[in-house]
């Protein structure tokens, strides 16, 4: 079964972990909203630097693959099984949204790009970035606001 890109990680994450991530996001929004426009701008800069779970999984997989290949070349050909297993896990994650490191990374608080964007756009709305969109109602204004 192939799940949607947006939902595949949350669907394969324990409900209490999803709820914890959602609470943290909502608390962040409330905290930075009370700090005003400058606090929101600083938080948006932080969000631009936040690694989503996909990036973390890709980095871990690439690192483990390189280690497995290096050990396969220098120590024993048996180590070549490591990159093969990792490739299988990456394929499983791409199709189903689950792989062995996923629960660990989610417990550590890694969010999906959609979850990060939820916070980003809530903060932008609070800062007033989308004010002109509803007033003008044109595609040009909507695109300009989306680029903020």
PLM regions and their residue ranges:
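Cytosol-facing regions at membranes
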Residues: 1-16, 131
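Cytosol/matrix-facing amphipathic helices and coiled-coil assembly/linker segments
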Residues: 9-51
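Organelle targeting or membrane-anchoring low-complexity regions in eukaryotic organelle proteins
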Residues: 124-148
């Amino acid at each position: 079964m192939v799940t949607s890109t947006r939902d595949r990680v949350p669907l394969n994450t324990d409900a209490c972990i999803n709820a914890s991530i959602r609470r943290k996001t909502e608390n962040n929004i409330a905290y930075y909203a009370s700090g005003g426009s400058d606090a929101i701008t600083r938080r948006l800069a932080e969000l631009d630097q936040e690694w989503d779970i996909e990036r973390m999984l890709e980095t871990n997989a690439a690192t483990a693959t390189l280690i497995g290949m290096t050990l396969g070349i220098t120590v024993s050909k048996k180590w070549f099984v490591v990159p093969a297993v990792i490739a299988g896990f990456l394929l499983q994650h791409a199709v189903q949204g689950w792989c062995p490191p996923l629960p660990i990374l989610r417990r550590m608080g890694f969010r999906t790009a959609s979850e990060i964007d939820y916070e980003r756009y809530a903060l932008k709305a609070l800062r007033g970035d989308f004010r002109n969109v509803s007033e003008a109602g044109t595609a040009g204004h909507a695109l300009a606001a989306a680029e903020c």
